[in-house]
Amino acid sequence: LFKDPEDPSKGRITSCISGWTCYTINLVKIMEYGLGDLYTNFDPGSGGALDAAIAGAFAKGQPIVTYYWTPTSLMGKPEIDMVRLTEPAYDKACWDKMMVVVNKIKADGPDAYEPSCANEYKDMALTKLATGKFAADNADIIAFADAYTITTSVVNNMLAYYVDESGGDMEATAMHYLENHSEWESWVPADVAAKVKSSL
């Protein structure tokens, strides 16, 4: 189904760039999941080429299995409808064991592979930070930052709007967000929300 045109006897998993650690992580995962004889861990060559491979597959109606991440503008495009594949749940002990093998392969090449463990990538959370002085001097801004939360899908959509529709205009993208979403109203006092809405 995901035939590798360079080796039609195998499928192709479009992976990371070979200089990125995720390329080697994906190689180990392919081996751990028993797919080493069935799929190649394909290096698309660059981040732009990875995006083009995904967008091209969707444009042509062709199947693709690939590594990717969010948030990105590509994932916000309405024509891109990716499904995250299920892997064993993230487990730190397993991940640490796998990373020992990943680092050996990075140092000594693919022949350094040895059976270990594999599971899904850990979802990362962003941490909001401010200096103590700034926080003490700007309680209203800190209250806003504490209340501010936005879903990954909305960030994807806004990034796509920024790249594809606003011409790279951050202010236009912010206005588009404010005009088309309402969750921001809970981040500010009601009178501030009313003033913002009246100015849109």
Language model features by range: what are they?
Residues 71-80, 115, 124, 154, ...:
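Extended, charge-rich low-complexity interaction segments
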Residues 12-98:
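Ligand-binding pocket segment of bilobal, Venus flytrap-like solute-binding proteins
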Residues 124-137, 160-161:
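A bilobed periplasmic-binding-protein/Venus flytrap-type ligand-binding module shared by bacterial periplasmic
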Residues 1-16:
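A conserved helix-loop-strand patch within extracytoplasmic ligand-binding domains
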Residues 77-120, 133:
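Short beta-strand->loop
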Residues 23-37, 47-61, 140, 144-200:
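An extracytoplasmic/periplasmic, membrane-proximal ligand-sensing/linker region
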Residues 14-18, 42-49, 118-120, 133, ...:
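Extracytoplasmic/periplasmic, Sec-exported soluble proteins
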Residues 8, 123-124:
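Short, solvent-exposed loop/turn segments at the edges of secondary structure
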